Regions:
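Positively charged, structured surface patches that bind polyanionic biopolymers
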Residues: 1-122
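Basic DNA-binding region of bZIP-type proteins
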Residues: 116-142
Length: 142
Protein backbone atom coordinates (compact mmCIF):
# COMPACT_ATOMS: atom_id res chain seq x y z
CA UNK A 1 0.00 0.00 0.00
CA UNK A 2 1.61 3.21 -1.10
CA UNK A 3 0.57 6.78 -0.76
CA UNK A 4 1.27 9.07 -3.69
CA UNK A 5 3.18 12.26 -3.13
CA UNK A 6 1.32 15.43 -4.05
CA UNK A 7 2.98 18.31 -5.86
CA UNK A 8 2.32 20.53 -2.84
CA UNK A 9 4.24 18.14 -0.58
CA UNK A 10 7.08 18.04 -3.10
CA UNK A 11 7.23 21.83 -3.41
CA UNK A 12 7.29 22.27 0.36
CA UNK A 13 10.08 19.70 0.73
CA UNK A 14 12.32 21.25 -1.92
CA UNK A 15 11.48 24.92 -1.32
CA UNK A 16 14.85 26.00 0.05
CA UNK A 17 17.05 23.15 -1.16
CA UNK A 18 19.51 23.61 -4.01
CA UNK A 19 18.66 21.27 -6.85
CA UNK A 20 21.62 18.94 -7.46
CA UNK A 21 20.96 18.62 -11.18
CA UNK A 22 18.73 19.90 -13.93
CA UNK A 23 17.45 17.67 -16.72
CA UNK A 24 17.07 19.44 -20.02
CA UNK A 25 15.82 18.04 -23.30
CA UNK A 26 18.72 18.18 -25.71
CA UNK A 27 19.45 19.49 -28.23
CA UNK A 28 17.90 22.77 -27.15
CA UNK A 29 17.72 23.98 -30.74
CA UNK A 30 15.10 21.34 -31.58
CA UNK A 31 12.57 22.48 -28.96
CA UNK A 32 9.46 24.32 -30.15
CA UNK A 33 10.18 27.22 -27.79
CA UNK A 34 13.66 27.68 -29.20
CA UNK A 35 12.34 27.48 -32.77
CA UNK A 36 9.84 30.23 -31.94
CA UNK A 37 12.60 32.28 -30.32
CA UNK A 38 14.82 31.79 -33.39
CA UNK A 39 12.03 32.82 -35.77
CA UNK A 40 11.36 36.01 -33.82
CA UNK A 41 14.85 36.99 -32.67
CA UNK A 42 17.14 35.56 -35.36
CA UNK A 43 20.74 35.15 -34.23
CA UNK A 44 19.96 36.86 -30.90
CA UNK A 45 18.15 33.64 -29.97
CA UNK A 46 21.48 31.98 -29.22
CA UNK A 47 22.35 34.72 -26.73
CA UNK A 48 18.85 34.39 -25.27
CA UNK A 49 19.46 30.67 -24.76
CA UNK A 50 22.72 31.42 -22.95
CA UNK A 51 20.83 33.83 -20.70
CA UNK A 52 18.14 31.17 -20.19
CA UNK A 53 20.73 28.58 -19.15
CA UNK A 54 22.27 31.05 -16.68
CA UNK A 55 18.83 31.88 -15.25
CA UNK A 56 18.11 28.16 -14.86
CA UNK A 57 21.39 27.77 -13.01
CA UNK A 58 20.58 30.70 -10.71
CA UNK A 59 17.03 29.46 -10.06
CA UNK A 60 18.21 26.01 -8.95
CA UNK A 61 19.86 27.55 -5.90
CA UNK A 62 17.42 30.40 -5.22
CA UNK A 63 14.80 29.93 -2.49
CA UNK A 64 11.55 28.80 -4.08
CA UNK A 65 13.41 28.27 -7.36
CA UNK A 66 11.96 31.48 -8.80
CA UNK A 67 13.92 34.67 -9.38
CA UNK A 68 12.82 38.20 -8.50
CA UNK A 69 11.89 40.18 -11.60
CA UNK A 70 14.31 42.99 -10.84
CA UNK A 71 16.18 43.79 -14.04
CA UNK A 72 19.03 45.55 -12.20
CA UNK A 73 19.59 42.46 -10.05
CA UNK A 74 19.27 40.12 -13.03
CA UNK A 75 21.81 42.22 -14.97
CA UNK A 76 24.21 41.97 -12.04
CA UNK A 77 23.82 38.18 -11.92
CA UNK A 78 23.96 37.70 -15.67
CA UNK A 79 26.58 40.19 -16.76
CA UNK A 80 28.30 41.27 -13.54
CA UNK A 81 27.27 44.81 -14.40
CA UNK A 82 24.38 46.79 -12.94
CA UNK A 83 24.14 49.18 -15.90
CA UNK A 84 22.82 46.56 -18.31
CA UNK A 85 19.26 46.27 -16.99
CA UNK A 86 17.71 47.12 -20.38
CA UNK A 87 19.69 44.29 -22.00
CA UNK A 88 18.59 41.88 -19.27
CA UNK A 89 14.99 43.03 -19.75
CA UNK A 90 15.22 42.46 -23.52
CA UNK A 91 16.46 38.89 -23.07
CA UNK A 92 14.00 38.02 -20.28
CA UNK A 93 11.04 39.43 -22.21
CA UNK A 94 12.05 37.40 -25.28
CA UNK A 95 12.21 34.24 -23.13
CA UNK A 96 8.77 34.98 -21.68
CA UNK A 97 7.32 35.55 -25.17
CA UNK A 98 8.73 32.20 -26.34
CA UNK A 99 7.36 30.30 -23.33
CA UNK A 100 10.76 29.51 -21.79
CA UNK A 101 9.94 31.62 -18.73
CA UNK A 102 6.82 33.11 -17.17
CA UNK A 103 5.79 35.60 -14.52
CA UNK A 104 4.04 34.24 -11.46
CA UNK A 105 1.20 35.95 -9.64
CA UNK A 106 3.78 37.07 -7.07
CA UNK A 107 5.80 38.91 -9.73
CA UNK A 108 8.63 36.38 -9.73
CA UNK A 109 10.28 34.90 -12.80
CA UNK A 110 9.65 31.17 -13.13
CA UNK A 111 11.36 28.79 -15.53
CA UNK A 112 9.29 25.71 -16.53
CA UNK A 113 12.41 23.52 -16.86
CA UNK A 114 13.35 24.31 -13.26
CA UNK A 115 9.77 23.90 -12.03
CA UNK A 116 9.61 20.35 -13.38
CA UNK A 117 12.86 19.37 -11.67
CA UNK A 118 11.85 21.19 -8.50
CA UNK A 119 8.74 19.02 -8.13
CA UNK A 120 10.59 15.84 -9.14
CA UNK A 121 13.35 16.45 -6.60
CA UNK A 122 10.82 17.34 -3.88
CA UNK A 123 9.07 14.02 -4.46
CA UNK A 124 12.40 12.26 -4.03
CA UNK A 125 12.94 14.08 -0.72
CA UNK A 126 9.48 13.18 0.58
CA UNK A 127 9.85 9.58 -0.58
CA UNK A 128 13.20 9.35 1.18
CA UNK A 129 11.77 10.61 4.47
CA UNK A 130 9.14 7.90 4.38
CA UNK A 131 11.80 5.21 4.33
CA UNK A 132 11.73 1.95 2.52
CA UNK A 133 13.48 0.96 -0.64
CA UNK A 134 12.55 1.96 -4.15
CA UNK A 135 11.01 -0.82 -6.15
CA UNK A 136 13.37 -2.46 -8.53
CA UNK A 137 14.40 -5.83 -9.82
CA UNK A 138 14.51 -8.46 -7.16
CA UNK A 139 17.87 -10.11 -6.99
CA UNK A 140 18.04 -13.87 -7.05
CA UNK A 141 20.07 -15.49 -4.35
CA UNK A 142 22.23 -18.42 -5.31
Amino acid sequence: MSRTISEDEAIEAAWSVQLPSLRLNMPLSSSNEFKLLRDVRGDKAYTDMGVWLRLCSLATSYKGHALPLDYEQLAQWLFGNVGKSTIAAEHVNALIAAGLAFLGADGSLYLPAVETEFVRYGKMIVGGTRGGRPRGKKKRRH
